[in-house]
Amino acid sequence: MSTAGKVIKCKAAVLWEVKKPFSIEDVEVAPPKAYEVRIKMVAVGICHTDDHVVSGNLVTPLPVILGHEAAGIVESVGEGVTTVKPGDKVIPLFTPQCGKCRVCKNPESNYCLKNDLGNPRGTLQDGTRRFTCRGKPIHHFLGTSTFSQYTVVDENAVAKIDAASPLEKVCLIGCGFSTGYGSAVNVAKVTPGSTCAVFGLGGVGLSAVMGCKAAGAARIIAVDINKDKFAKAKELGATECINPQDYKKPIQEVLKEMTDGGVDFSFEVIGRLDTMMASLLCCHEACGTSVIVGVPPASQNLSINPMLLLTGRTWKGAVYGGFKSKEGIPKLVADFMAKKFSLDALITHVLPFEKINEGFDLLHSGKSIRTVLTF
């Protein structure tokens, strides 16, 4: 029996308040309006950005259904939708690509003005919500809200992918892999023979390591205080791994000594102000490029000496690895299907969706790289 045009009742993980566990609830998911798509989720990854909301470091309206790194199958579409149809395998896009705004028209940028990241409203693009629980409307997250058996997204925030794609793997291309990998190949534009440093060896950091390797870097120095992550980093391309706690001097000084004055490219993939500064300082003062990839804590500012940049450093930021999402994500999936890279090493745990809180416990303990929840 078709569910198109009808309210769907299903399970979702609702965050009612910060610093509390998720609650598995019965929710109602309204049908898609014009230019919207309703998706049956198949697999979703647990990303640090979701945890930033739980911890209170990233502020978004509550109660909310989080989740933004996922893959699923189109259940139904609203009026006017032309780029996907029911039955298509898709990845929701936490940064849309409307194709019409100034950013989308600029070939060098991807932070579409239809995004809900900079100043979150917790709605779809028309300003309304599609989730109800216990009679209350529930907010969306980044226009995706994938911690639900069904979700509704705008058409410009979903990408059709290869019908043969294994969704329990390519869900990582929805955020973690593309964000890290693209930060190296698209944003920093790592060059062959160069020296790189990657701060933070979670799923995104390891994907940045993979990007540096793919771009031909000669040295890739992985930096983390958790030595348990070093073997995986080396497996994926790191040439050296260092723990800041093993040194008496600041880690940027250690890196500068190791690299004749500083690395060519550095990546902060943690989201801490102190490591953002260390990452900037460890790149060469005359020709280094440092990229901020980790989401910073809310309402905290950095103050820096302008001389750090005047000498020739470049300091950049990146969302979604610089990929124009609706165009770039299907191409990455095609590359995965062509075996140009593997995602297996990033997925350390697979759990049923109902065990979402266990998945976040694994994240907090540092025992997981990526936990994938299956529906």
From Swiss-Prot:
Changing residue 370 to C: In beta-3/Indianapolis; allele ADH1B*3; decreased NAD(H) binding. Gene3D superfamilies: Medium-chain alcohol dehydrogenases, catalytic domain, NAD(P)-binding Rossmann-like Domain. GO terms for molecular function: alcohol dehydrogenase (NAD+) activity; all-trans-retinol dehydrogenase (NAD+) activity; zinc ion binding. GO terms for cellular component: ciliary basal body; cilium; cytosol; nucleoplasm; plasma membrane. GO terms for biological process: retinoic acid metabolic process; retinoid metabolic process; retinol metabolic process. Its main location: cytoplasm. Zn(2+) 1 binds at residues 47, 68, 175. Belongs to the zinc-containing alcohol dehydrogenase family. It is an enzyme of class 1 (oxidoreductase). The modification N-acetylserine is found at residue 2. This is All-trans-retinol dehydrogenase [NAD(+)] ADH1B. The keyword Cytoplasm applies. There are 7 different ADH's isozymes in human: three belongs to class-I: alpha, beta, and gamma, one to class-II: pi, one to class-III: chi, one to class-IV: ADH7 and one to class-V: ADH6. Zn(2+) 2 binds at residues 98, 101, 104, 112. Dimer of identical or non-identical chains of three types; alpha, beta and gamma. Keywords: Acetylation, Cytoplasm, Lipid metabolism, Metal-binding, NAD, Oxidoreductase, Phosphoprotein, Zinc. Catalyzes the NAD-dependent oxidation of all-trans-retinol and its derivatives such as all-trans-4-hydroxyretinol and may participate in retinoid metabolism. In vitro can also catalyze the NADH-dependent reduction of all-trans-retinal and its derivatives such as all-trans-4-oxoretinal. Catalyzes in the oxidative direction with higher efficiency. Has the same affinity for all-trans-4-hydroxyretinol and all-trans-4-oxoretinal.
